[in-house]
């Protein structure tokens, strides 16, 4: 998976956790870039109206110092309904969060405990509604060190 040399450390780490290999590139970027050859777009430092890249899995990142100051967490934007259902299971230990714990069957798949707490989600919705139509990118290749020489 192609990853810019200058990006946040968790990007190549996440690629490695999926079982893929990282190929670092000299891409100069601002706000967002694609993890080629996949339709995954890292938009961790961009949040502006109309930014969604059609037919992609566009990753947003939240932090108290970012454009949308929602504690810490993220979101994946996509128009792929099957992927949305998979993400919903994956974020909640492979379980359907609508089923009460005492009625819950075994997990449908191996998942993670990575859902956004309801209080943060509510704050995020509030901030989404208040967000400006256009925001300057809060990061790009100029903001990060070259991490291609790190041992992974």
Residue ranges and their predicted role:
Residues 1-50:
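PLP-dependent aminotransferase-like
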Residues 53:
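Nucleotide-sugar donor-binding and catalytic loop/hinge architecture
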Residues 47-49, 57-152:
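Active-site region of PLP-dependent enzymes
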């Amino acid at each position: 998976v192609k990853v810019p040399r200058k990006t946040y450390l968790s990007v190549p780490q996440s690629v490695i956790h999926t079982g893929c290999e990282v190929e670092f590139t000299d891409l100069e970027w601002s706000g967002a870039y694609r993890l080629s050859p996949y339709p995954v777009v890292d938009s961790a430092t961009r949040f502006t109206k109309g930014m969604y890249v059609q037919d992609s899995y566009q990753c947003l990142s939240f932090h108290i110092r970012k454009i949308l100051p929602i504690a810490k967490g993220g979101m994946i934007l996509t128009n792929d309904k099957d992927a949305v259902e998979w993400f919903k299971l994956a974020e909640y230990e492979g379980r359907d969060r609508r089923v009460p714990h005492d009625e819950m069957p075994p997990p449908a798949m191996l998942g993670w405990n990575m859902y956004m707490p309801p209080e943060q989600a509510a704050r995020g919705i509030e901030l989404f509604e208040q967000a400006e139509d256009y925001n300057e990118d809060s990061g790009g290749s100029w903001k990060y060190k070259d991490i291609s020489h790190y041992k992974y």
